[in-house]
Amino acid sequence: LLGVWALSWLSVPALVKGPLERIASEQLGRTVTVGSLDFKPWSLELTLRDLSVAGANGAPAQLTIGRVYVDAELQSLLRLAPVVDAFTVENPALRLTHLGQGRYDVDDVIAKLTAPKDEAQTPPSTEPARLALYNLLLQGGRVDFTDNAVGKTHSVQDLLLSVPFISTLSDKKEVRVEPRLAFTLEGSRFDSSAQSTPFAQTRHADAHIRWDDLDLAPYLGYLPASLPIRLKAATLDVDVKLAFEQTPRLAVKLSGQVQTRDVKMTDREGQDLLAFDRLTVDMADVRPLEQVVNLTQVELLKPVLHAQRDAAG
């Protein structure tokens, strides 16, 4: 057994690194490189360092990641589904550029990923993917968004995101992280921390996200040009609780209210299409991993729809 472990420890990095870079490059249409790969067969721990996705047309790297750590479980083999005890991404840096008129420097990657698949392939299943991911952590993240149309760069720094679990299986593992989102945007700090006692004691944790009077107008120009409608004005209010529960069973639940106000939409030619004073959605129990949506109320106030029937009907 020790010999098998030693052979795996020595051979897996060399056997996996090349195919991983090749397959990832083919899927994205960009050159993907991995600085080093380390695998510990006795604990099923995999570490990637210095991962990079090339930029378009010789531009600087689109994405770099300092370290990716995966602590897999033997149950992954027994259950034929990924079961991961810890997943960590350290120091990811993403560079995005708005070229103008709704075009971005990652349009080629998006087109590659969303291209129609072979029709002969089996249709995708409507069932949730089978997986169990625990202790997800992204830290030291950075996003630089350059708008060539106006000559400005917006930066998100010190991005931290921790999620206790994302699971559609019944496995229960030790949870060591609390739900949290924190970042610095243009010098302003945002930090959403857990609103409960430690998860390890109660098997329950809540994260509360709230934004009031968020004017979306400055960001509407960044919507993709391929959209059939144009959003011209909108104000967003969010008051949502995200709950992670491990007893009596695994669950990720959303509740609260999302509201949009003073919304105006046009078609591609700029003709009025839809406007309304307010759309309010009250969520009682939304469980995305279980495809369950329970709403207490959906209210649309003063909608105005502009429609025309052409000669073709």
Each model region followed by its residue ranges:
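N-terminal type II signal-anchor transmembrane helix
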Residues: L1-L28, R95, A312
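Short extracytoplasmic
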Residues: E26-D50
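Secondary-structure transition motifs
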Residues: R30, D50-I166, L227-A233, R249-L250, ...
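Flexible, solvent-exposed coil segments and beta strand-coil junctions
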Residues: D50, G141, L159, K172-V175, ...
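Transmembrane beta-barrel wall of Gram-negative outer-membrane proteins
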Residues: K232-E245, A251, R261
